[in-house]
């Protein structure tokens, strides 16, 4: 089994108010974000014991990841999780990319109505200690993939708290790690943070440095700036940030008791961990 992050540099402990992230420093001086992503792809390829399956949602993060593996010259397959007509507004970007690049994706079909009504969504949320209702269906899809599963679960996120820029991690998003571990899924949910060098290279990217020095008026986080960072290396179309649940949320399915049950999990599993940008950079910089 692959470690969820390289050399287990990123681990967590506790739950809720006691939830914490523990980090190990870089083992070499980071190069650019792009170069470190290429290196991480090579590490995963060399370490994997089964074919690499890249989970492609249609979002910027997963498209950047797929491009990285292409540039690295690594063999891989692509998997797309489908909720039928409910998430085509999101997956259309993945389908279009695959068509343009001659990729035949693996389609993981999920009957989202049955997934909710049957209570499967609650079962998985409890097993993964996940308090975000949009996530268990993705976890369910991952469990159906045969191979080494690679996800791109967001960039190293930095947020502006009244002028104080902080690196932030949430327990609900990191519940993917619980699912991979509990189900014995090989791979990583966090390709864009797989090594400490990726994390530090992103945090010290010139665009992020401008952000944290308040040189970009009106910007509140790295969410919008990452398109600019990713687009230095690849041509990526602008798109909204989707969860894939936007159409489902307009239906009566949301009246199902499952959602109140999952919401109650926030009392236990909704931890947040923050470090100032300065501290996180110091903490994971290579030891002298």
What annotation goes with each model-predicted range?
Residues 1-52, 68, 74, 78-84, ...:
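Nucleotide-activated chemistry modules centered on ATP-dependent adenylation/adenylyltransferase
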Residues 53-57:
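Class I SAM-dependent methyltransferase core
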Residues 61-62:
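Catalytic nucleophile loop
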């Amino acid at each position: 089994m692959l470690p969820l992050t390289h050399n287990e540099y990123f681990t967590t402990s506790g739950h809720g108010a006691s939830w914490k992230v523990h980090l190990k420093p870089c083992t070499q001086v980071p190069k650019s974000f792009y170069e470190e992503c290429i290196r991480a792809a090579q590490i995963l390829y060399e370490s994997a014991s089964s074919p690499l399956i890249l989970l492609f949602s249609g979002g910027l993060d997963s498209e950047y990841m797929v491009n990285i593996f292409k540039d690295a010259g690594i063999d891989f397959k692509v998997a797309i999780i489908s909720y039928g007509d409910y998430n085509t507004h999101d997956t259309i970007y993945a389908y279009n990319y695959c068509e343009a690049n001659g990729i035949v994706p693996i389609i993981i079909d999920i009957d989202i109505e049955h997934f909710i009504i049957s209570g499967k969504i609650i079962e998985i949320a409890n097993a993964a200690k996940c308090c975000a209702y949009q996530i268990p269906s993705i976890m369910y899809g991952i469990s159906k993939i045969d191979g080494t599963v690679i996800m791109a679960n967001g960039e190293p996120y930095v947020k502006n708290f009244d002028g104080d820029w902080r690196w932030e991690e949430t327990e609900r998003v990191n519940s993917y790690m619980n699912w991979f571990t509990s189900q014995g899924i090989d791979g990583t949910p966090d390709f864009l943070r797989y090594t400490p060098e990726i994390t530090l290279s992103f945090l010290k990217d010139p665009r992020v440095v401008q952000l944290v020095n308040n040189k970009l008026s009106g910007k509140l986080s790295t969410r919008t700036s990452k398109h600019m960072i990713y687009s230095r290396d690849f041509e990526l179309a602008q798109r909204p940030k989707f969860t894939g649940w936007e159409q489902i949320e307009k239906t009566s399915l949301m009246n199902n008791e499952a959602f109140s049950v999952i919401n109650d999990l926030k009392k236990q599993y909704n931890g947040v961990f923050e470090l100032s940008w300065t501290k996180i950079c110091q903490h994971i910089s290579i030891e002298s």
